[in-house]
C-alpha cells in the first residue's frame, strides 16, 4: 500500500462509546499517502487495531464536575465520553465549552445537542471564534478567563479536560494554571498536526 515517512500505523481517538454497535474514529483527510489509503478503504475492509491506549477518560468520582474545554477536532474523544455518560446516566455534572471557527467547522454539534436534551447533567456551550451565526446569542471569540468564569463559578471544584490542537491545549493549560487551578486536576489530549 501507498505510505509516507510515518509508515502505515497511526493513533486515533474513538468517537464511539463502548455501548454503541460500531467502532468509529474521526480524522481530517489531508492529502497524505496514509490518508489516501484510508479514504479509499471499502466498507467492510479489514484493518488491524491495537489495544486502546491513553487515560483521557471521565474520572470516577461523580461528586466532582467535569469541565471540557476543547477546540475543533478535540471533540473526537469527548463525543464518546459524553455519549457513554449519557447512556449510563452517570451522576457526573459535565460542561463542554467547544470552540470552533464556525458552525460549519464544528464536529459532532448534532450529537452534543442531542446529549444535552437527553442528559440533565450535561451542558453544551458552543463557542465560535470567526464566523458567528446570525442572531447568535451564545459565546463568541476565543475562550478566555472571563468565558470560563461565566460558566464555572467554583474553579477548584471540577476535573478539567483539555482536548484539541496542540497550541490550543497548551494555551488553555497555561490559562488554567494562571487561574490557580491545580495542575493535578487538568487532563489533556493533544492533536498534533491540526
Q: Regions from the language model: what does each represent?
A:
Residues 51-62:
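A short, basic/flexible loop-to-alpha-helix module at the beginning of a structural domain
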Residues 14, 75-87:
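Histidine-anchored nucleotide/phosphate-binding helix
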Residues 34, 93, 97-194:
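Reductase modules of NAD(P)H-dependent flavoproteins
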Residues 60-64, 155-156:
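Short helix-loop-beta connector
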Residues 39, 61, 80-82, 109-110, ...:
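Short amphipathic alpha-helical segments
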Amino acid at each position: 500500500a501507498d505510505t509516507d515517512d510515518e509508515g502505515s500505523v497511526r493513533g486515533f481517538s474513538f468517537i464511539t462509546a463502548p455501548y454503541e454497535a460500531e467502532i468509529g474514529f474521526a480524522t481530517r483527510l489531508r492529502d497524505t499517502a496514509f490518508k489516501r489509503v484510508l479514504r479509499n478503504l471499502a466498507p467492510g475492509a479489514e484493518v488491524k487495531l491495537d489495544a486502546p491506549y491513553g487515560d483521557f477518560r471521565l474520572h470516577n468520582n461523580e461528586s466532582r464536575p467535569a469541565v471540557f474545554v476543547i477546540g475543533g477536532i478535540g471533540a473526537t474523544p469527548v463525543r464518546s465520553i459524553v455519549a457513554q455518560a449519557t447512556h449510563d446516566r452517570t451522576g457526573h455534572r459535565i460542561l463542554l465549552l467547544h470552540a470552533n471557527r464556525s458552525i460549519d467547522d464544528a464536529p459532532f454539534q448534532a450529537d452534543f445537542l442531542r446529549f444535552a436534551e437527553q442528559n440533565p447533567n450535561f451542558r453544551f456551550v458552543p463557542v465560535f471564534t470567526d464566523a458567528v451565526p446570525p442572531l447568535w446569542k451564545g459565546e463568541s471569540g476565543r475562550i478566555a478567563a472571563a468565558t470560563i468564569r461565566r460558566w464555572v463559578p467554583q474553579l477548584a471544584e471540577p476535573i478539567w479536560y483539555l482536548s484539541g490542537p496542540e497550541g490550543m491545549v497548551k494555551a488553555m493549560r497555561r490559562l488554567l494554571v494562571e487561574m490557580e487551578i491545580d495542575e493535578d486536576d487538568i487532563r489533556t489530549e493533544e492533536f498534533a498536526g491540526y
